[in-house]
From Swiss-Prot:
Keywords: Calcium channel impairing toxin, Disulfide bond, Hydroxylation, Ion channel impairing toxin, Knottin, Neurotoxin, Presynaptic neurotoxin, Secreted, Toxin, Voltage-gated calcium channel impairing toxin. It comes from the Eukaryota. Omega-conotoxins act at presynaptic membranes, they bind and block voltage-gated calcium channels (Cav). The presence of a 'disulfide through disulfide knot' structurally defines this protein as a knottin. The cysteine framework is VI/VII (C-C-CC-C-C). Expressed by the venom duct. Its main location: secreted. Disulfide bonds join 1-16, 8-19, 15-26. SUPFAM superfamilies: omega toxin-like (SSF57059). PROSITE patterns: OMEGA_CONOTOXIN. Coiled coil: none annotated. GO terms for cellular component: extracellular region; host cell presynaptic membrane. The modification 4-hydroxyproline is found at residues 4, 7. This is Omega-conotoxin RVIA.
Length: 27
């Protein structure tokens, strides 16, 4: 999974925690 702070898309679940919609980053 992607570590916190990594860029992500809210529609994908590849973060270790969750993708934050306000900054489009994990964690």
């Amino acid at each position: 999974c992607k570590p916190p702070g990594s860029p992500c898309r809210v529609s994908s679940y590849n973060c270790c925690s969750s993708c934050k919609s306000y900054n489009k980053k994990c964690g």
